[in-house]
């Protein structure tokens, strides 16, 4: 059985046993070695380059690999097959999907102003901030030979008195740890739960000083995932962060993700990539940053496109791309954090913003709601320009929407220098109109060298080239320009 050694730039080598004829890109994915493949391995993007260091691969020159590069050992992993033992070098850019965790500066005036404006606008539209979750600290008499009331009844009586409710529900996940927590804290505890009319449903029992009740809002983009923790009592933001979507190594757009999840074991791989590799680490990081415990998250909401929603819950998404393009669900009720093994409170409801169609999902539902165009007399245009691009047009009388694939057109597609907004990407550009000298801004630490151009950089460059009359309105270079060769 052949062995393939992946020498990852800046990382430890990974050795994998395989069979003759195995596709190198598929082998790398099975070994969790990240190789950038926006087209998901169909050979059209030319981004999945690796370098053969030792041994042989069945691979041939292509339009993406010149004869000179081929002689140097460069290959496309998607079109390379294993023929025996070999060692390949994987460039660091291949792990670009593993974007470094970024935590926002919540004290910045811009962050505060945007959030406050959103809340104010929703309130004016009749959507008020409400909270049915409670954290109550109760003290109970410790049991004795003269007081043999069981723990659950002791807690129930204390909560009925503290909250003025008629009924208290203690679910299994709380009951199994109740005895330990009560005695560890001398029967002085904080109980968190949901107040539903005259019923209080316990969700967590913990130390009396742990009184935080937290909400978690998640935007699952095809390329980037952003998360916000909020205080459910005050509505204030506690922490905010973002990271790359771990699914990116299975394709840059939703079509390639759907194709990949249709392969044997594909759904589990893509669900693990978004949950275990992406969401769970962000939750742990933000809870630590905010100084709260993960079980304090009592409610979660998710905004994502239709395909991302399917892959999140592990539902087959094939019907999304097949005629007549009918998703498995628009609205999903009753989903809990424990169903997805998310490290929040196991009983936390997970609200998935409803999808509208196969390619217009809950992210647009949420964005339309937050933008307020649904409650305005003026005709407005709401644009979400990400990996998936969506547009909503209308006012309080009507709303129409459409979608397209936007990000890969800039980042992978047929732009040889295109890349995502990770280290080494040119993200902004200005051109001096007199000297025609360009100045660029590059993602990464100081001294970072340019590797390619991301979407915002390409838009900036085109804008500057046109402003300085280096290109014309048709996008063609003006040949008499002093900098044109």
Question: Would you name each region that the model predicts?
Answer:
Residues 461-485:
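Gly/charged contiguous loops adjacent to phosphate- or pyrophosphate-bearing nucleotide/cofactor binding elements
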Residues 1-14:
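Eukaryote-biased recognition of intrinsically disordered, low-complexity regulatory segments
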Residues 27-31, 36, 47-97:
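Iron-sulfur (Fe-S) cluster-binding segments and ferredoxin-like electron-carrier domains
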Residues 218-222, 227-255, 319-333, 366, ...:
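Glycine-rich phosphate-binding loop of actin/hexokinase-like ATP-binding domains
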Residues 47, 296-306, 385-387, 478-484:
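A glycine-rich phosphate-binding loop feature that marks nucleotide/adenosyl-phosphate handling sites
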Residues 69-71, 76-217, 222, 234, ...:
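Nucleotide/phosphate-binding catalytic cleft detector across ATP-hydrolyzing
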């Amino acid at each position: 059985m052949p062995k393939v050694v992946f020498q990852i730039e800046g990382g430890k080598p990974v050795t994998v046993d395989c069979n003759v004829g195995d596709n190198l890109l598929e082998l790398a994915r099975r070994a969790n070695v990240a190789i950038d493949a926006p087209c998901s391995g169909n050979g059209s993007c030319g981004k999945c380059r690796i370098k053969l260091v030792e041994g042989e691969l069945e691979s041939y020159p292509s339009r993406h690999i010149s004869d000179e590069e081929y002689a140097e050992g460069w290959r496309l992993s998607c079109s390379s097959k294993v023929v025996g033992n070999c060692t390949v070098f994987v460039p660091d850019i291949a792990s670009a999907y593993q974007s470094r965790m970024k935590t926002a500066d919540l004290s910045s005036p811009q962050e505060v102003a945007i959030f406050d404006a959103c809340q104010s606008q929703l309130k004016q539209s009749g959507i008020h901030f409400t909270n049915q979750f409670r954290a109550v600290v109760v003290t109970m008499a410790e049991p004795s030979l003269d007081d043999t009331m069981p723990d659950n009844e002791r807690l129930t009586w204390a909560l009925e008195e503290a909250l003025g409710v008629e009924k208290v529900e203690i679910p299994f996940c709380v009951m199994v740890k109740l005895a330990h927590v009560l005695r560890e804290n001398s029967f002085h505890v904080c109980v968190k739960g949901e107040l539903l009319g005259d019923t209080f449903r316990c969700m967590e029992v913990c130390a009396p000083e742990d009184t935080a009740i937290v909400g978690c809002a998640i935007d699952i983009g095809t390329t980037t995932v952003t998360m916000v923790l909020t205080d459910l009592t005050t509505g204030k933001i506690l922490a905010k962060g973002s990271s790359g979507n771990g699914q990116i190594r299975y394709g840059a757009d939703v079509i390639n993700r759907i194709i990949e999840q249709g392969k044997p074991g594909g759904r589990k791989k893509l669900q693990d990539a978004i949950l275990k590799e992406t969401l769970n680490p962000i939750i742990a990081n933000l809870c630590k940053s905010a100084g709260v415990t993960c079980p304090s998250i009592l409610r979660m909401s998710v905004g994502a496109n239709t395909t991302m929603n399917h892959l999140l819950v592990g539902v087959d998404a094939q019907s999304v791309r097949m005629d007549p393009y009918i998703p498995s669900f628009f609205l999903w009720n009753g989903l809990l954090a424990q169903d997805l093994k998310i490290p929040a409170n196991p009983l936390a409801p997970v609200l998935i913003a409803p999808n509208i169609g196969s390619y217009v999902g809950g992210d647009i539902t949420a964005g339309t709601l937050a933008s307020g165009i649904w409650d305005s007399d003026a005709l407005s245009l709401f644009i979400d320009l990400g990996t998936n691009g969506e547009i909503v047009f209308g006012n309080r009388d009507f709303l129409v929407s459409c979608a397209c694939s936007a990000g890969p057109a800039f980042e992978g597609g047929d732009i040889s220098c295109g890349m995502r907004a990770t280290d080494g990407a040119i993200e902004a550009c200005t051109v001096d109109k007199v000297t025609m000298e360009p100045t660029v801004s590059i993602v990464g630490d100081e001294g970072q060298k340019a590797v390619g151009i991301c979407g915002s950089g390409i838009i900036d460059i085109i804008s500057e080239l046109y402003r300085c009359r280096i290109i014309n309105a048709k996008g063609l270079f003006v040949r008499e320009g002093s900098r044109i060769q």
